[in-house]
């Protein structure tokens, strides 16, 4: 195969790979707990896996808590594992109104200046001084995915939600690149409802900014 034909073939393959669907992950309200906070809420009870998530090593746990805010409560909020260094609560704007909490839009882990909340388990309750956020929509990917899609960690991209009958483009989608991540876009339930992302054929693709 001559050089020009090889380059043309490689370019075509890469173009096709760039157009492949990006899996959608709809994040319902959930919590991450530090080992210390977990031990206080579930004393003497090890965290147990209920269902593996797409991202390697991450899972939905059997354990749930109630979120209690100034105006209301949300019950059966799932704990995601493994345990982290700092506790964090991720909710939607709709959830924030139910709870009466002014949760800011943040990337996971960016918790400075965030409001706190009361967590209630079947065994105990604690109050977090901070840690409640509305998660910024984002795409997880490996370095190879980033190379194919021509993006880098920290980029902000536009993404179209397709296959729903009500195509919707989201801008300000953060790119998160890590060697141990698999390609997946994360949106919350408010965003998913707006896009009809619960449709069986729903998927995401990178879109050109307007």
Swiss-Prot record:
Pathway: Polyol metabolism; 1,2-propanediol degradation. GO terms for biological process: propanediol catabolic process. Its main location: other. There are 2 Zn(2+) ions per monomer; Zn(2+) and CoA bind inbetween the 2 domains in each monomer. GO terms for cellular component: bacterial microcompartment. It catalyses: propanoyl-CoA + phosphate = propanoyl phosphate + CoA. The keyword Transferase applies. PANTHER family: PHOSPHATE PROPANOYLTRANSFERASE (PTHR39453:SF1). This is Phosphate propanoyltransferase. It comes from Citrobacter rodentium (strain ICC168).
């Amino acid at each position: 195969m001559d050089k020009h034909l090889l380059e043309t073939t490689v370019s075509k393959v890469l173009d096709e790979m760039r157009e492949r669907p990006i899996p959608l992950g709809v994040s319902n309200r959930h919590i991450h707990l530090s080992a210390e906070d977990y031990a206080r809420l579930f004393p003497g009870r090890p965290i147990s896996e209920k269902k593996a998530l797409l991202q390697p090593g991450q899972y939905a746990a059997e354990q749930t808590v109630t979120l209690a805010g100034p105006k209301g409560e949300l019950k059966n909020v799932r704990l995601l594992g493994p345990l982290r260094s700092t506790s964090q609560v991720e909710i939607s704007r709709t959830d924030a109104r139910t709870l009466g909490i002014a949760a800011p839009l943040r990337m996971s882990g960016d918790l400075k200046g965030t409001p706190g909340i009361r967590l209630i388990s079947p065994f105990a309750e604690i109050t977090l001084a901070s840690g409640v956020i509305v998660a910024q929509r984002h795409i997880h990917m490996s370095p190879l995915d980033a190379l194919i899609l021509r993006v880098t960690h920290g980029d902000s991209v536009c993404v179209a939600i397709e296959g729903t009958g009500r195509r919707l483009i989201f801008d300000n989608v953060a790119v998160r690149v890590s060697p141990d991540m698999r390609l997946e876009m994360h949106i919350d339930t408010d965003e998913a409802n707006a896009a009809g992302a619960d449709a069986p054929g729903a998927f995401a693709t990178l879109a050109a900014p307007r």
